[in-house]
Every structure is written in C-alpha cells, then in structure tokens.
C-alpha cells in the first residue's frame, strides 16, 4: 500500500492508503472523496476526475496519452500544465506520498 493525499479546493486534506494497481479515481470514489466524481468509471471519457498533480510527482507519473489530453481540453476548471485525469494515474510504489489538488469544480 502506498499513500495518496487529496487536497480539496477548500484546503481539506485526506490521506488514503491505496493498493498498487488501483487508479487514484477508484481510490477517491471508494473512500468518499466527493470532489472527484468519475462518471465514466475510469475510461477517460468524462473529465470528472480532473486533478492537479503536485510538482514533486509530475515526472513520476506516466505521460498522458492522446485520449486523456483530449478530455483535459474539456475540463471546466482551469487547465494547468500539471492537470491530469486521476482515472489514468495508477498507483505504484514510486508514487507513494503523491499529493493531488482537486479543483473547485468537475462540471
């Protein structure tokens, strides 16, 4: 298990233990992180799991594929260089301690 910290737009921090192989979206939805919706169930087709990856981890997270990049263009919150869909971030030991900021809206 590795740690993930979700920081809500209001500054609330939730730390979760997440098993390797589980997406950050799955972990969030399963543990009541209500700011992350995940309507599509993890297929990168809805952009309701948009997060900002902490800069200390941007190089550790695999690059976004074309599908994810296309969906990121649809997000309603500000698009930043560290914007990602957390359904596409799969937990690995290298990501232990990752911090993601959740924007103020997913719609």
UniProtKB/Swiss-Prot annotation:
Its cofactor is [2Fe-2S] cluster. GO terms for cellular component: cytosol. The oxidation of camphor by cytochrome P450-CAM requires the participation of a flavoprotein, putidaredoxin reductase, and an iron-sulfur protein, putidaredoxin, to mediate the transfer of electrons from NADH to P450 for oxygen activation. Keywords: 2Fe-2S, Electron transport, Iron, Iron-sulfur, Metal-binding, Transport. The gene is camB. Residues 2-106 form the 2Fe-2S ferredoxin-type domain. One of its GO terms (biological process) is P450-containing electron transport chain. [2Fe-2S] cluster binds at residues 40, 46, 49, 87. Belongs to the adrenodoxin/putidaredoxin family. One of its GO terms (molecular function) is metal ion binding. Monomer. Binds 1 [2Fe-2S] cluster. This is Putidaredoxin.
């Amino acid at each position: 298990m590795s740690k993930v910290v979700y920081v809500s737009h209001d500054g609330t921090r939730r730390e979760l233990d997440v098993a390797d192989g589980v997406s950050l979206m799955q972990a969030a939805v399963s543990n009541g992180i209500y700011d992350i919706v995940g309507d599509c169930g993890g297929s990168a087709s809805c952009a309701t799991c948009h997060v900002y990856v902490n800069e200390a981890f941007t190089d550790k997270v695999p690059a976004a594929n074309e599908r994810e990049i296309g969906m990121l263009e649809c997000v309603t919150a500000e698009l930043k260089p560290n914007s990602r869909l957390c359904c596409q971030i799969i937990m690995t030991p290298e990501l232990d301690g990752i911090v993601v900021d959740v924007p103020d809206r997913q719609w």
